[in-house]
């Protein structure tokens, strides 16, 4: 499933710009039951425009929390995010503008410091003053289209892959990255019932901590045959060296030319998913491989030592009731045990690319480097309302340190839709042990904890959205 400004209906216009796991479940149930999976970048209706308003309020008792909420930052304290979204769609051109006004009343919290690739995890406070009392523009951009071909530029949030909790390569955990793109607007017929979808994108310039420019270049290719879907993507993080001249023109074609490829970080990602509409079941498996030079050795020899995976299922109309559903998702990015003997690079660990983060948050799997993440959930969903309860178990630094960070979390989300108004409530209760890797072996055997090891956080988010269609 590719969620790139997908539209279930006009009533969900702004909601699908601001994706979260509940919205993905609502969208998927609609698609699975009706046998429709729309990937369109903009609505089908021509010569139309819509105006939406969203008001978010949050309260948080400790360290930052929440993943996959379009890069929104919820530190200790309370605050609000006020936003508007205007978009226009015609036969050949579409554009959207999404100003956001952010007010954070943040309370200082002293936490053990996390370093390196763990410094961009979601529970680490951001220092930038940009996150407080600032005006930002999100989901803003321009698209030109002819027939089924689209090209344009914007900073819309993206998601690639069949998961709703994680993707190995692209999620909306971080703010949307400004990028250029070209691709098809939806699945296009190829042969018989076989259809395809394609997108090629290159990010605008980003800068690492040394001030060097770098880019993300990627393509996505999907094939669908009836209820079976195959996906492949390739991501190259390129640039990042002050002594190697590199520009956006180079980034535009690096996927084709392979120029300086031995210096760049590459991920090749695959997934397969199967839908069973008669039973309301969806199952999937996503696997990804890092590609590095290993000191001039052939990376293909060691590709199995770099594999990450994400697998899961979602079942709608469960236990004989149309409104009941359940599912699980398990992501594994644990670094191999023999990393100090056999070349075994870690996911998202390159400082030259800010550990695969944008403005302090990782754009791929939020659990991050050397981690695993298990989510199980059950819920009630109908056309107007939903309530979903989930339990999450997550570990960070599994190979890096003993004991690793361990997170237990319970969560509940409630939504209600009335005409063009959508109300969303999300509450999470999080408990972490060994935060910041402050504990060592003796703490485990003695069942003791160092100061700062145990962290508890409760976070509440309330969102009210309304959309006008013209």
Which positions does each model-derived feature cover?
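Sequence/structural signature of outer-membrane beta-barrel proteins
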Residues: 58-60, 66-69, 104-106, 149, ...
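Outer-membrane beta-barrel transmembrane domain signature of Gram-negative proteins
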Residues: 111, 117-143, 164-171, 242-268
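Exposed, low-structure sequence patches enriched in small/polar residues
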Residues: 135, 228-236, 240-470
């Amino acid at each position: 499933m590719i969620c790139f400004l997908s539209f279930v209906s006009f009533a969900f216009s702004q909601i699908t710009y601001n994706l979260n796991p509940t919205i993905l479940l609502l969208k998927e149930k609609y698609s699975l039951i009706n046998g429709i999976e729309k990937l369109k970048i903009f609505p089908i209706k021509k010569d139309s425009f819509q105006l939406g308003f969203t008001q978010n309020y949050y309260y948080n008792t400790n360290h930052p929390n929440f993943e996959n909420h379009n890069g929104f930052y919820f530190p200790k304290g309370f605050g609000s995010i006020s936003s508007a979204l205007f978009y226009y769609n015609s036969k050949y051109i579409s554009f959207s503008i999404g100003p956001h006004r952010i007010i954070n009343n943040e309370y200082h919290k002293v936490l053990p410091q996390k370093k390196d690739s763990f410094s961009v995890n979601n529970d680490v406070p951001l220092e930038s003053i940009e996150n407080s009392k600032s005006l930002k523009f999100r989901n803003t951009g321009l698209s030109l289209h002819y027939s089924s071909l689209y090209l344009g530029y914007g900073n819309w949030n993206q998601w690639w892959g069949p998961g709703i909790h994680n993707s190995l390569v692209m999620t909306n955990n971080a703010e949307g990255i400004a990028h250029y793109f070209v691709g098809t607007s939806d699945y296009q017929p190829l042969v018989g019932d076989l259809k395809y979808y394609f997108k090629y994108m290159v990010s605008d310039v980003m800068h690492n901590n040394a001030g060097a420019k770098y880019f993300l270049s990627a393509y996505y290719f999907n094939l669908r045959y009836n209820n079976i879907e195959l996906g492949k993507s390739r991501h190259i993080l390129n640039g990042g060296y002050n002594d190697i001249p590199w520009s956006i023109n180079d980034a535009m074609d690096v996927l084709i030319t392979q120029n300086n490829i031995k210096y760049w970080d590459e991920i090749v990602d695959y997934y397969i998913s199967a839908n069973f509409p008669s039973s309301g079941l969806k199952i999937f498996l996503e696997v990804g491989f890092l590609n590095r030079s290993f000191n001039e050795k052939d990376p293909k020899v060691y590709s199995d030592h770099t594999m990450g995976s994400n697998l899961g299922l979602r079942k709608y109309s469960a236990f004989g009731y149309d409104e009941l559903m359940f599912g699980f998702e398990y992501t594994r990015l644990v670094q191999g045990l023999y990393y100090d003997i056999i070349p075994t690079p870690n996911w998202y660990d390159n400082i030259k690319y800010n550990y695969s983060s944008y403005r302090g948050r990782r754009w791929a799997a939020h659990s991050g480097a050397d981690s695993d993440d298990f989510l199980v959930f059950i819920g009630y969903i109908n056309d107007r309302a939903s309530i979903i309860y989930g339990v999450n178990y997550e570990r960070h630094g599994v190979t890096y340190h003993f004991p690793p960070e361990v997170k237990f979390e319970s969560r509940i989300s409630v939504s209600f839709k009335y005409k063009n108004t959508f109300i969303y409530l999300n509450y999470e209760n999080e408990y972490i042990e060994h935060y910041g890797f402050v504990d060592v072996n003796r703490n485990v055997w003695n069942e003791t904890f160092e100061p700062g090891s145990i962290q508890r956080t409760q976070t509440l988010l309330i969102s009210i959205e309304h959309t006008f269609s013209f």
